[in-house]
């Protein structure tokens, strides 16, 4: 039976206004819209009155419910029937944890009530199209129609393909019907194999074969034999990549054989809890570094949010599934798309060339895709610290004559680093009889055929198959699985995981054969033991679906009880679905139909399928010299600062958590003005050291339209000039991931790909001492469609994205582009050696040209000398600022440095030649360094020692003030206010934020950028940062116990434990499941801290589901009430823990006036480094800190204080319960965005109880307790940041 329960309003006023504006623009006479959530409960038994009241209370969250009956025509948007939304999975979990076992499933829809004039059927279809994503959702016209969401169907049996009766044609038909993308020779192979077996194949076997042998999974082109211009080539592409490892194997521990590559890390204290006692401690051991970069291009073109989200999720799983289990740590992301064409902000180079119906626009991709990727990283608890964004779409005369080149099929790049124990780097041995396990969520009828689908050019497959290959994301589930993997690797030698792979393209049909085959075993499986939420799925759908957040593992039979215990504690679902066999055979039994859908020797599936041969021709580029008529420097500057590749990326940065883990030493945002221009991302290796890891990206794809090899060399060069900004040492410490995107089969591209791989793998990397131990290829970067009567194609340029990773010697020595105005000199190191080529530059692009000669690596020895010289100068502390030259050339490099330093520049380019345009806008490799004037001679001497004397040019100095002036021989070449340039540079991000978020907030942030008087972040402390008030208490040897409380989805517990540990506490890991099952109680604890993250993925209101699982469980409720009423206890709630505790008001004495915390005014997750002031309050944790003003990490989507009315706010203030407020950079309490990131009245962001024993706050002091993890800080701070005082105050209070 189904119950319907009304929910809160679903759209804020500005979202409704945006919808109305869209309808008006489409000439649809819609006058008014009201939208509210509607909940549907599928019940297996009736609820009594108390249970019904409990369910109603559970589903009461967010803004107050509307009291009126809605007016207008109902359009009910729900998830597509036959799918289960991530919201449903998490909300159902909460209902069960609150004791409501009668609830089979909760689901949620949005009821839109549309008031409109008379609309035709076609117009109503337009309205519904605007309101839902057809890939994920459906529209009903009656609330009762939602019954279809819970419809159950009978299982369907396996289908046989009549190969023996119909011959080869049966396979050809199945290939089309199932979208298998099989090549002719593969059809021959299958016909031969099954004829030898003497039986017909089942659909599931063909599907499994197609996924396992798709280009996506098998990399056929990279393993192919090559004939170019009639000449047999000596090596495959992959062999040339492997050549880098054969030449420079130094520091590589694992390459080419696992889900990620591993290199040597540093010996540090890894901080985690003991399995038996739950007590956190440091464990001194090597933290080796793993690295991986994936792409998820096809799904992102079809449905950007889930496409990008599952792209990030899949890459995170690759990291976790490395060796015998590892820990993902920090991420990077990248996008290449066609022109944005923002309405009202179209740029002169953006022509509309059309696109196929089934893919979304570049603007849609960049509105939704980054949000999806960020949301997954945020909820999983991984900071996203690095990225790139390129737009390109043009009709150009390239290798193949005049044609359309661009990114209708986008690049969505997801990568990152993690850490792994030395003894877990290599996979274990799978014993015969080992249990084969699926860890993670249930099978669902989604994401079918992703591997084969992404191996086709967009436009080749059927639209229904595109639907089928879109996945959905549940990062909170992946977090639970990762917690299990963490518990396993933390056991060291007792780790129950023998072998692990993630489930990706092809689902279990790819993952399980890969697992057993890699372990030298076969496997027998039971189909019906696979967890499934949809009983009507066919065997093919159960075995081959790509439900995300799953891993496959081999676990020794005798360790299964331990594994079971770990999973139950973390509430991570798992199923034993088979066991490993001696015989290399794969069998899948179906208990329901008592038959065998799969019964194959492994070598038929993964054996010697036909090897590909590429027989291709070379084409020469046809670029024309740049036509300069009509190009002025002033006009060029404004255009280039508007080009998204160059323009400010704040809209892509602040949506992503950049402080979680407490180990982020360098994020994108630089300096007191928080400008997104960092050269590279840097993390600390642990919470107790200054060793670290660095990541940087290089890519220069448009250059490939003129010179394939140069484009590839520049990508490597740019990654190197970016990562050089931190202290790494020997260049052999740097390892690269190479992600290759090409339109295979397009005239000239295959030969170009070979040329590019050869340039990097055989020549440049070996010469530099660089290794490429990991990478990925996507070989179908073309889109076809019909535009009227014309057949059109959009082909991407050959695109190599290089991600560089390295161990860092000392993270404190990372250099940023932030200029200083002390007596200084700016030096350009020009690795272009005066070539100043303008082909395929930003300048050429914004004037709709390609040019002829591009930049290149001009001298490999000098590139190596450059890296070594910068490393020497970093180690000697001779550099004040550093920024590489890239897109936009020298002018953009200097401008970004001036933005970061909030200063002026007096530059002189006389020494760069007479061609001013080329001097300012060429994109040859190089960098600008800032040094003290007194050090200039010594620095130039170091550069000369490294063979760079002829590359160094003095180009002026940074000065106070707002003028950005470039001269040559006394003549002004360009002069503008730095603030004006800063505003131009910000206009793209402003327009994107206006479109996507609350436009009022976007306007306020943009306005702030034009204020030259803004002093930036600054610090005023009322206490001595170096005084340790806990020292006398630590000296007694007594360590009070703090319960570090977490719920499923919480992700900030480790850094929180570390902060309390440093202050003299014994930090104990306490999961809510420990309390609910009675394994642990709170009676032994002196302090309790509820940590940040996304408990239950923030469904049913941030922190509210967590709170209700306490309030609705009598024993646990009493336990919390007793703790809060006990004198001599302390409690802290941070972020999600703050939201949770604010919902426990009825249990916490003196908290009656506490507010609720609701959706940010921006309607967006906000990750900021914000200034707060400590106010006079009873809070025991903030004693002695009153009046201090200091920055703190902020990361939340629901942090806005909501009070009942003005009287409630006045009472909260007059009782002195406000503990922290947001202030602007002038020190004034503020409600203005983004200084106040959530719009809370009076800047309120922390409150306390009347006794001061319980304090809750939205910002994260635990993420910045170490100075090194602050995005910016005054130079005189030592190891401890000022927020360490909170934790020491706690220790002091407990005596």
From Swiss-Prot:
It holds the Pfam family FGAR-AT_N. It is found in: Cytoplasm. It catalyses: N(2)-formyl-N(1)-(5-phospho-beta-D-ribosyl)glycinamide + L-glutamine + ATP + H2O = 2-formamido-N(1)-(5-O-phospho-beta-D-ribosyl)acetamidine + L-glutamate + ADP + phosphate + H(+). One of its GO terms (cellular component) is cytoplasm. Keywords: ATP-binding, Cytoplasm, Glutamine amidotransferase, Ligase, Magnesium, Metal-binding, Nucleotide-binding, Purine biosynthesis. GO terms for biological process: 'de novo' IMP biosynthetic process. Pathway: Purine metabolism; IMP biosynthesis via de novo pathway; 5-amino-1-(5-phospho-D-ribosyl)imidazole from N(2)-formyl-N(1)-(5-phospho-D-ribosyl)glycinamide: step 1/2. Its main location: cytoplasm. It is an enzyme of class 6 (ligase). Mg(2+) binds at residues 718, 722, 884. The active site is at 1135 (nucleophile), 1260, 1262. ATP binds at residues 307-318, 678, 886. Residues 1042-1295 form the Glutamine amidotransferase type-1 domain. GO terms for molecular function: ATP binding; metal ion binding; phosphoribosylformylglycinamidine synthase activity. Its EC number is 6.3.5.3. In the N-terminal section; belongs to the FGAMS family. This is Phosphoribosylformylglycinamidine synthase.
């Amino acid at each position: 039976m189904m119950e319907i329960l009304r929910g809160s309003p679903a759209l804020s006023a500005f979202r409704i206004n945006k919808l109305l504006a869209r309808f008006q623009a489409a000439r649809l006479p819609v006058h008014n819209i009201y939208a509210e959530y509607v909940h549907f409960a599928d019940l297996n038994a009736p609820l009594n009155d108390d249970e019904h009241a409990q369910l109603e209370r559970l589903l009461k969250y967010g803004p107050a419910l509307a009291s009126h009956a809605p007016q207008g025509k109902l359009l009910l948007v729900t998830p597509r029937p036959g799918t289960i939304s991530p919201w449903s999975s998490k909300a159902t979990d909460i209902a069960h944890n609150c004791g409501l076992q009668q609830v089979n499933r909760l689901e949620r829809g949005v009821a839109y009530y549309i008031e409109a004039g008379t609309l035709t059927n076609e117009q109503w279809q337009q309205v519904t199209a605007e309101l839902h994503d057809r890939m994920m959702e459906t529209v009903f016209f009656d609330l009762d129609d939602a019954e279809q969401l819970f419809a159950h169907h009978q299982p369907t049996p396996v289908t046989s393909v009549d190969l023996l009766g119909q011959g080869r044609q049966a396979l050809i038909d199945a290939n089309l019907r199932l979208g298998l993308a099989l090549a002719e020779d593969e059809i021959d192979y299958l016909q031969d194999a099954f004829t030898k077996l003497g039986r017909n194949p089942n659909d599931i076997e063909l599907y499994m074969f197609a996924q396992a042998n798709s280009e996506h999974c098998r990399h056929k082109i990279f393993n192919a034999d090559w004939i170019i211009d009639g000449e047999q080539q000596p090596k495959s592409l992959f062999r040339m990549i492997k050549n880098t490892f054969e030449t420079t194997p130094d520091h590589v521990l694992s390459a080419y054989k696992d889900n990620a590559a591993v290199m040597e890390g540093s010996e540090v204290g890894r901080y985690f809890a003991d399995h038996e006692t739950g007590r956190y401690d440091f464990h001194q051991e090597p933290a080796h570094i793993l690295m991986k970069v994936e792409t998820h291009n096809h799904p992102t073109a079809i449905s950007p949010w889930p496409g990008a989200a599952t792209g990030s999720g899949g890459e995170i799983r690759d990291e976790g599934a490395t060796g015998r289990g590892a820990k993902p740590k920090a991420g990077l992301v990248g996008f290449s798309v066609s022109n944005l064409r923002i309405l009202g902000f179209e740029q002169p180079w953006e022509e509309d060339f059309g696109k196929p119906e089934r893919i979304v626009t570049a603007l849609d991709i960049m509105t939704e895709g980054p949000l999806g990727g960020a949301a997954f990283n945020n909820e999983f608890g991984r900071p996203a610290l690095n990225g790139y964004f390129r737009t390109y779409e043009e009709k150009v005369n390239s290798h193949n004559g005049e044609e359309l080149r661009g990114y209708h099929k986008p690049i969505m790049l997801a990568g990152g680093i993690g850490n792994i124990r030395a003894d877990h780097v290599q996979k274990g041995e799978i014993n015969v009889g080992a249990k084969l396990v699926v860890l993670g969520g249930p099978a669902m009828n989604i994401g079918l055929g992703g591997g084969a689908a992404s191996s086709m050019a967009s436009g080749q497959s059927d639209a229904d198959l595109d639907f089928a290959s879109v996945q959905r994301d549940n990062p909170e589930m992946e977090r639970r699985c990762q917690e299990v993997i963490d518990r396993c690797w933390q056991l060291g030698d007792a780790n129950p995981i023998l072998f692990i792979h993630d489930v990706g393209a092809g689902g279990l049909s790819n993952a399980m054969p890969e697992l057993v085959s890699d372990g030298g075993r076969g496997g027998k499986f039971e189909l019906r033991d696979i967890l499934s939420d949809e009983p009507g799925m066919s065997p093919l759908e159960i075995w081959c679906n790509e439900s995300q957040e799953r891993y496959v593992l081999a676990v020794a039979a005798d360790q299964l009880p331990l594994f079971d215990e770990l999973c139950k504690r973390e509430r991570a679902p798992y199923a034993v679905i088979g066991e490993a066999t001696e015989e290399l055979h794969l069998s899948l039994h179906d208990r329901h139909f008592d038959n065998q859908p799969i019964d194959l020797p492994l070598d038929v599936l993964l054996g010697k399928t036909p090897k590909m041969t590429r027989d291709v021709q070379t084409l020469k580029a046809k670029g024309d010299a740049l036509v300069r008529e009509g190009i002025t420097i002033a006009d060029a500057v404004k255009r280039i600062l508007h080009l998204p590749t160059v323009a400010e990326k704040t809209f892509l940065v602040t949506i992503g958590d950049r402080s979680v883990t407490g180990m982020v030493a360098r994020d994108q945002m630089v300096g007191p003005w928080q400008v997104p221009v960092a050269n590279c991302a840097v993390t600390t290796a642990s919470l107790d050291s200054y060793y670290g890891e660095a990541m940087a990206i290089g890519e220069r794809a448009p250059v490939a339209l003129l010179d394939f090899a140069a484009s590839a060399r520049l990508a490597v060069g740019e990654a190197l000039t970016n990562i050089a900004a931190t202290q790494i040492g020997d260049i052999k410490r740097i390892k690269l991931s190479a992600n290759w995107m090409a339109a295979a089969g397009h005239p000239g591209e295959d030969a170009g790909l070979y040329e590019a791989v050869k340039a990097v793998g055989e020549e440049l990397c070996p010469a530099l001492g660089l290794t490429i131990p990991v990478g990925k290829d996507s070989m179908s970067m073309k889109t076809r469609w019909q535009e009227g009567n014309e057949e059109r194609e959009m082909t991407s340029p050959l695109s190599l994205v290089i991600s560089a990773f390295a161990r860092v010697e000392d993270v404190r020595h990372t250099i940023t582009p932030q200029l200083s105005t002390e007596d200084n000199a700016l030096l350009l190191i020009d690795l272009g050696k005066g070539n100043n080529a303008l082909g395929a530059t930003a300048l050429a692009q914004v004037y709709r040209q390609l040019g002829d000669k591009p930049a290149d690596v001009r001298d490999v020895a000098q590139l190596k000398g450059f890296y070594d010289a910068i490393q020497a100068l970093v180690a000697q502390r001779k550099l004040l600022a550093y920024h590489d030259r890239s897109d936009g050339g020298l002018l953009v490099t200097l401008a970004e440095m001036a933005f970061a330093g909030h200063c002026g520049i007096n530059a002189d380019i006389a020494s760069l030649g007479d061609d001013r345009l080329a001097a300012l806008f060429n994109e040859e490799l190089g960098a600008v360094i800032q040094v003290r004037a007194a050090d200039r001679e010594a620095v130039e001497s170091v550069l000369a020692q490294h063979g760079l004397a002829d590359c160094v040019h003095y180009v002026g100095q940074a000065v106070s003030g707002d003028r950005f002036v470039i001269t040559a021989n006394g003549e002004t070449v360009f002069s503008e206010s730095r603030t004006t340039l800063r505003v131009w540079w910000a206009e793209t991000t402003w327009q994107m934020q206006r479109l996507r978020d609350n436009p009022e907030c976007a306007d306020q942030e943009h306005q702030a950028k034009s204020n030259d008087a803004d002093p930036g972040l600054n610090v005023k402390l009322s206490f001595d940062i170096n005084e340790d008030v806990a020292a006398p208490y630590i000296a007694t040897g007594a360590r009070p116990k703090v319960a570090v409380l977490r719920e499923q989805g919480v992700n900030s517990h480790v850094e929180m434990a570390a902060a309390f540990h440093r202050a003299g506490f014994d930090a104990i890991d306490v999961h809510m499941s420990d309390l609910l099952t009675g394994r642990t109680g709170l009676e032994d604890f002196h302090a309790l801290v509820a940590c940040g993250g996304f408990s239950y993925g923030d469904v049913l209101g941030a922190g509210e589901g967590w709170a209700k699982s306490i309030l609705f469980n009598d024993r646990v409720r009493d336990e919390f009430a007793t703790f809060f009423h006990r004198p001599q206890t302390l409690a802290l709630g941070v972020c999600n823990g703050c939201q949770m505790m604010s919902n426990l008001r009825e249990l916490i004495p003196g908290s009656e006036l506490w507010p609720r915390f609701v959706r940010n005014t921006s309607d967006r997750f906000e990750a900021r480094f914000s200034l707060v002031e400590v106010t006079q309050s009873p809070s025991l944790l903030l004693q002695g800190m009153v009046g201090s003003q200091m920055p703190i990490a902020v990361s939340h989507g629901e942090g806005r204080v909501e009070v009942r009315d003005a009287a409630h706010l006045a009472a909260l203030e007059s009782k002195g319960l406000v503990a922290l407020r947001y202030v602007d950079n002038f020190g004034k309490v503020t409600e203005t965005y983004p200084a106040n990131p959530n719009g809370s009245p009076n800047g309120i962001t922390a409150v306390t109880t009347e006794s001061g024993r319980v304090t809750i706050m939205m910002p994260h002091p635990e993420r910045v307790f170490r100075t090194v993890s602050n995005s910016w800080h005054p130079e005189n701070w030592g190891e401890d940041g000022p927020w360490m005082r909170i934790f020491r105050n706690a220790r002091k209070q407990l005596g």
